[in-house]
């Protein structure tokens, strides 16, 4: 990161958005932790990849707030600061509507999403894929990795080759995880069937 970028990042006021995101502390995740931590993980991924756009970072901190807290007053988000309305619009763009199936949502981001929406969605998916290593429902893990390959890889191709590579590596890793889990499970079944006490 250049000195100029570090100075720009230093001037970005994130605390009010972090404060709003604390509303997600009670929302748990299948892989452990809570949705609040996921917001911060997503922001950290963006910074790690050199994204320091203030609207993008602010939106990443609250990107699940509209979806996970349906009763959330969006005016609180709009009125946070001078960029609040832009942040709200980006959060809306990456929020799946209740009548939208996941494949349609991801296709919409791919075909019509702004560059920031695409970047945010890829960072969000990287965070989700990392925590997927702590999920024990193998059918879900398989379905999610397939969905990532089919719908999110193309989005990543549009925004950042390094992020795409990380997603590809995570998908490979999670598929090995499922295979290893299935091997262990089949050995346990075999051992149980041979145990004649």
Set out the residue ranges of the language-model regions.
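Active-site helical microenvironments for divalent-metal-assisted chemistry
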Residues: 1-197
